């Protein structure tokens, strides 16, 4: 399949990341590898979106610490970045609203075609050419001094060269006009870009719990965006899908990562990581990256808590 006809994908993972584990990063890597192997997708970026402090989960440390740990966990990645938008809102945001925020942001910033699974868009957003030196200003009076997500595309097919949080002197994001070329590869209007929710099979299983999720939100998440599921703890996504009429309805929008990996996906568990820290268990190095461990110890996180 030609690169111009492949769907370009940004993987978005929402969660507490309390703390972020090696398994969380493995989920991104495994999902990207699998999607590339299908020949239908090009994963150009990954976004980690930690939950707001008001989520109310026992033992949840402040978003300041969780954002810092996430940044340390991905500091050597050239395609996974941490986005603070969810943490900086006035209150907790639903997964659906986070997905919609990033979809709308990408429309404004990139000029790419962003499509739902079943209703692909045909009208790109019109703005300023990316390769021009002058940058128009996108006004947002609520930005204050908070980090702003800025996305700069490198060569399509090689992924995002940067998706990071900065504190600009001016409140700006770059736009792309309808005639702009993306380097020498293709026109922006020819790129179909989708944001897919990345999760483990445990989150997918929670869709089957009555009353836990808003029905209309589930419809949007699965029906409009789509999900990439990484199996964990021997929970098979296919079995979960068969237990939900809504998941069965949109089963073609649920992509299950199938690979030969022997990664023990249980190490995604932040709970096990916290317990290892509390008990001084040396196996914590199996769960957390060393920079995250160093940060936890320096900040005295989780050591004296039972969350």
Curated annotation (Swiss-Prot):
CDD domains: NMNAT_Eukarya (cd09286). NAD(+) binds at residues 16-17, 92, 95, 200, 202, 212-213, 232. It is found in: Golgi apparatus membrane; Cytoplasmic vesicle membrane; Cytoplasm; Cell projection, Axon. Its cofactor is Mg(2+). Its EC number is 2.7.7.1, 2.7.7.18. SUPFAM superfamilies: Nucleotidylyl transferase. Pathway: Cofactor biosynthesis; NAD(+) biosynthesis; NAD(+) from nicotinamide D-ribonucleotide: step 1/1; Cofactor biosynthesis; NAD(+) biosynthesis; deamido-NAD(+) from nicotinate D-ribonucleotide: step 1/1. It is an enzyme of class 2 (transferase). The keyword Nucleotide-binding applies. GO terms for molecular function: ATP binding; nicotinamide-nucleotide adenylyltransferase activity; nicotinate-nucleotide adenylyltransferase activity; protein ADP-ribosyltransferase-substrate adaptor activity. ATP binds at residues 24, 271-274. PANTHER family: NICOTINAMIDE MONONUCLEOTIDE ADENYLYLTRANSFERASE, NICOTINAMIDE_NICOTINIC ACID MONONUCLEOTIDE ADENYLYLTRANSFERASE 2. This is Nicotinamide/nicotinic acid mononucleotide adenylyltransferase 2.
């Amino acid at each position: 399949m030609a690169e111009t006809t492949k769907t370009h994908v940004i993987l978005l993972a929402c969660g507490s990341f309390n703390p972020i584990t090696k398994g969380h990063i493995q989920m991104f890597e495994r999902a990207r590898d699998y999607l590339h192997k299908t020949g239908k997708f090009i994963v150009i970026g990954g976004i980690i979106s930690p939950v707001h402090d008001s989520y109310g989960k026992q033992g949840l440390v402040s978003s300041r610490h969780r954002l810092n740990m996430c940044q340390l966990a991905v500091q050597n990645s050239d395609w996974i970045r941490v986005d603070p938008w969810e943490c900086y809102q006035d209150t907790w945001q639903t997964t659906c609203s986070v997905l919609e925020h990033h979809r709308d942001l990408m429309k404004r910033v990139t000029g790419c075609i962003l499509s739902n699974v079943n209703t692909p868009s045909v009208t790109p957003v019109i703005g300023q050419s990316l390769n021009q030196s002058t940058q128009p200003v996108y006004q947002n009076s609520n930005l204050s001094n908070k980090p702003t997500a800025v996305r700069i595309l490198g060569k399509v097919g090689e992924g995002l060269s940067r998706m990071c949080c900065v504190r600009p002197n001016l409140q700006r994001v770059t736009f792309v006009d309808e005639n702009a070329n993306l380097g020498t590869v293709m026109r922006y209007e020819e790129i179909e870009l989708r944001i897919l929710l990345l999760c483990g099979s445990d989150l997918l299983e929670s869709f089957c719990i009555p009353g836990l999720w808003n029905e209309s939100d589930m419809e949007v998440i699965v029906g409009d965006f789509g999900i990439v599921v990484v199996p964990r703890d021997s929970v098979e996504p296919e079995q979960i899908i068969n237990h939900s009429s809504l998941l069965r309805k949109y089963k073609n929008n649920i992509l299950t990562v199938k690979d030969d990996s022997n990664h023990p996906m249980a190490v995604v568990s932040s709970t096990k990581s916290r317990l290892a820290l509390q008990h001084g268990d040396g196996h914590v190095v199996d769960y957390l990256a060393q920079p995250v461990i160093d940060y936890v110890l320096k900040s005295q996180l989780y050591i004296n808590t039972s969350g």
